[in-house]
Amino acid sequence: MNSDSKITPLRPKRPCPECGKPSARDTFPFCSARCKDIDLNRWLKGAYVIKARDDEEEPDADEPK
């Protein structure tokens, strides 16, 4: 009996967010290192932005806490 037949996947396969191909275990949630790098490059270039709430004020560095 082959021991590989008893191995279950860690997570269900989902489509790659970049190209739609099935994801790979070693580059999850992407299908390849290429798609993973494309996504990282978009984050580094600022193409993706997580908006902050407008009512949040940043504390001044000069003010004591």
From Swiss-Prot:
It holds the Pfam family YacG. Residues 1-24 are annotated as: Disordered. GO terms for biological process: regulation of DNA-templated transcription. GO terms for molecular function: DNA topoisomerase type II (double strand cut, ATP-hydrolyzing) inhibitor activity; zinc ion binding. The keyword Metal-binding applies. The keyword Transport does not apply. Binds 1 zinc ion. Keywords: Metal-binding, Zinc. Its cofactor is Zn(2+). It comes from the Bacteria. Gene3D superfamilies: Erythroid Transcription Factor GATA-1, subunit A. Zn(2+) binds at residues 16, 19, 31, 35. Interacts with GyrB. Inhibits all the catalytic activities of DNA gyrase by preventing its interaction with DNA. Acts by binding directly to the C-terminal domain of GyrB, which probably disrupts DNA binding by the gyrase. Belongs to the DNA gyrase inhibitor YacG family. HAMAP family: DNA_gyrase_inhibitor_YacG. This is DNA gyrase inhibitor YacG. It comes from Mesorhizobium japonicum (strain LMG 29417 / CECT 9101 / MAFF 303099) (Mesorhizobium loti (strain MAFF 303099)).
